[in-house]
């Protein structure tokens, strides 16, 4: 059984719901999912021991939430090179944050990223069955790459 960390922040609760549903998908695929708010992670040592990392942030003003920017500086110190990664987030008008996080994980952290790329979900779809199922599918797809 592989262990996946889902680290996120959320202002309205939508990205948190996405994190929970992605974790459900990971568990459905037979792996362990641990969910943490990024504000609870205080050191790079807390990022060790996982096989994959899925980071989530809502998009505000075409960018990730400020706490995610701070977290990425911490995560860079954790030396996640070669680990599997993914990124997700909710949005109202534009969904740029997950792609920015994804690119940082790929090009700065040198992580192996999920084949699906980053995952965006319009806030209005987070509370409907199809949206939550899409989140579960994203979690399952990450597990397919974990083996």
Give a label for each model feature.
Residues 8-9, 38, 90:
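Cofactor-binding loop segments of dinucleotide-utilizing enzymes, especially the Rossmann-like FAD-
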């Amino acid at each position: 059984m592989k262990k996946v960390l889902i680290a996120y922040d959320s202002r309205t609760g939508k990205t948190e719901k996405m994190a929970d549903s992605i974790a459900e998908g990971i568990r459905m695929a037979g792996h362990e999912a641990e969910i943490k708010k990024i504000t609870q992670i205080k050191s790079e040592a807390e990022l060790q021991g996982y096989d994959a990392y899925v980071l989530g942030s809502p998009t505000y003003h075409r960018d990730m939430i400020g706490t995610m920017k701070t977290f990425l500086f911490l995560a860079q110190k954790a030396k996640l090179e070669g680990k599997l990664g993914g990124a997700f987030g909710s949005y109202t008008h534009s969904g740029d944050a997950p792609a920015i996080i994804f690119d940082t994980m790929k090009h700065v952290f040198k992580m192996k990223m999920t084949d699906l790329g980053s995952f965006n979900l319009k806030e209005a779809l987070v509370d409907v069955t199809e949206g939550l199922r899409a989140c579960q599918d994203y979690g399952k797809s990450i597990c397919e790459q974990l083996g």
